[in-house]
């Protein structure tokens, strides 16, 4: 792709998200979503092949359907309130339809089916954009309309997302699909606490973007997309492989790594709100995610022979990329659990 066109498309994606986050007019918000969606599709098809074409088509159809639902909710709310801007009161029907549309854009269960398929069909760079940046705009609207959202709908979707994010990743061998199911589960954790403490959702979002971005960048350095290729990188880049495995354990929420911090604080918040049964179910279901991450770590690090047969190693040129920002990202993604007391005081 021409660098100038790539820059223009990237700026349009950023501009679309910023319009959504900074607008108080529903029509401008809808236009921002459309700008963002139409600009991100060429980024998904940057590697021009049938898989990326299929992934981009699935993404377009899903997002277009969500945009239609969003416009329907905006029109119903306009008929109810008579104005285009945010109000303290929203028609209950419009609120439910808008929540469902934003859940579809985020990939929350039961509208999650497109996330693993689209993530698997695109490159690692496009997958990074899809699972991090593309979550900001819908989450900002959900954060804004939190007072008028039905909390039962959010809690049902969050519990279902955490369960599906755990079950779906159990039998996967593709690392991109594993991260996609992890994304579904993390979105569920964010939605569970949104109705009780929206600030906690922002903390979880920050930690999720930090850990997912670092993991994707490590995959790019190691040029690995499957569990088999990951297990064969020990001889080539042992430090990078170790970092990937630690990052995955952090994504799974294993203490004392940083991924445990948002889960700990969300469970604490739900317990304060007398949702003890929900907090218990979420903690138990989160073990599914942790299980397949630990299983992947065990299979990669403890069951391989010290020296792999050279015939099994893929040919690869030495990377010339300068990844000077990776060490601080890895440290922030794994060793920030001691910040928990400060977070509790701020909360």
From Swiss-Prot:
InterPro entries per the record?
Complex_I_Subunit_2, NADH_DH_su2_C, NADH_UbQ_OxRdtase_chain2, ND/Mrp_TM
Tell me the keywords, alphabetical order.
Electron transport, Membrane, Mitochondrion, Mitochondrion inner membrane, NAD, Respiratory chain, Translocase, Transmembrane, Transmembrane helix, Transport, Ubiquinone
Where is it localised? Answer: Mitochondrion inner membrane
Q: What class of enzyme is it?
A: translocase
Gene Ontology cellular component annotations, sorted alphabetically: mitochondrial inner membrane
Transmembrane annotation, as ranges: 3-23, 25-45, 59-79, 96-116, 122-142, 148-168, 178-198, 202-222, 240-260, 276-296, 326-346
GO MF annotations, alphabetized: NADH dehydrogenase (ubiquinone) activity
A Pfam family recorded for this sequence:
NADH_dehy_S2_C
Keyword Electron transport listed: yes
Q: How does it assemble?
A: Core subunit of respiratory chain NADH dehydrogenase (Complex I) which is composed of 45 different subunits. Interacts with TMEM242.
Return the similarity comment. Answer: Belongs to the complex I subunit 2 family.
Record's function text:
Core subunit of the mitochondrial membrane respiratory chain NADH dehydrogenase (Complex I) which catalyzes electron transfer from NADH through the respiratory chain, using ubiquinone as an electron acceptor. Essential for the catalytic activity and assembly of complex I.
Q: What is this protein called?
A: NADH-ubiquinone oxidoreductase chain 2
Instruction: Look up and give the organism this protein is from.
Output: Peropteryx kappleri (Greater dog-like bat)
């Amino acid at each position: 792709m021409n660098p100038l066109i790539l820059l223009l498309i990237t700026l349009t994606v950023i501009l679309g998200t910023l319009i959504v986050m900074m607008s108080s007019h529903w029509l401008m918000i809808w236009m921002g979503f459309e700008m963002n969606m139409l600009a991100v599709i060429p980024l998904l098809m940057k590697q021009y092949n049938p898989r990326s074409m299929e992934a981009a088509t699935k993404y377009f159809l899903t997002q277009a359907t969500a945009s239609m639902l969003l416009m329907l909710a905006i029109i119903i709310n306009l008929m109810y309130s008579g104005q285009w801007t945010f109000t303290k009161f929203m028609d209950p029907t419009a609120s439910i339809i808008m929540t469902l549309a934003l859940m579809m854009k985020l990939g929350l269960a039961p509208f999650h089916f497109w996330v693993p398929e689209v993530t698997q069909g695109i490159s690692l760079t496009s997958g990074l954009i899809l699972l991090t940046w593309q979550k900001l705009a819908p989450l900002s609207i959900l954060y804004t309309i939190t007072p008028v959202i039905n909390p039962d709908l959010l809690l049902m979707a969050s519990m279902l997302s955490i369960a599906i994010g755990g079950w779906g990743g159990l039998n996967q061998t593709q690392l991109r699909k594993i991260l996609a199911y992890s994304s579904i589960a993390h979105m569920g954790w964010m939605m569970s606490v949104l109705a009780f403490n929206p600030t906690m959702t922002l903390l979880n979002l920050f930690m999720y973007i930090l850990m997912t971005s670092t993991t994707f960048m490590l995959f790019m350095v190691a040029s690995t997309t499957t569990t088999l290729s990951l297990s064969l990188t020990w001889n080539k880049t042992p430090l990078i492989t170790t970092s990937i495995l630690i990052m995955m354990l952090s994504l799974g929420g294993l203490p004392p790594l940083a991924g445990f911090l948002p889960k700990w604080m969300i469970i604490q918040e739900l317990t304060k709100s007398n949702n003890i049964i929900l907090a218990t179910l979420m903690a138990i279901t989160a073990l599914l995610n942790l299980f397949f991450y630990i299983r992947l770590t065990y299979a990669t690090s403890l069951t391989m022979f010290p020296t792999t047969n050279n015939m099994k190693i893929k040919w690869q040129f030495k990377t010339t990329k300068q990844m000077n920002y990776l060490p601080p990202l890895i440290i922030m993604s794994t060793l920030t659990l001691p910040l928990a007391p400060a977070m509790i005081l701020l909360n």
